[in-house]
Amino acid sequence: MHPDLSSHLHTDECNVAINLLKKCHSENQFLKYFGQCNDFDREMRKCLKKEYEDRRAKSRARSEHMKQRLLNAEKQADN
């Protein structure tokens, strides 16, 4: 299962992949069940995974920054 595919939640690169997959599904109503759109799906999932990893790294960096600020504030309060 993948996340919400709303365009405002993803990068332009992923939106292109999402739109290609949706177009393939609409043009191939029955062949999509036999793997006609699998390449588009793989491309989309690869892009979504990259977005997820980028968000996760950014969140971790922000968390480390906030933790460091908290530790520095405690040290200054002790002095």
Curated annotation (Swiss-Prot):
Boundaries of every CHCH domain copy: 11-55
Intrachain disulfide bonds: C14-C47, C24-C37
InterPro entries: Cyt_c_biogenesis_Cmc1-like
Biased segments, Basic and acidic residues type: 52-67
Keywords, ordered alphabetically: Disulfide bond, Mitochondrion
Motif (Cx9C motif 2): 37-47
PROSITE patterns in the record: CHCH
Name of the protein in its database record: COX assembly mitochondrial protein 2 homolog
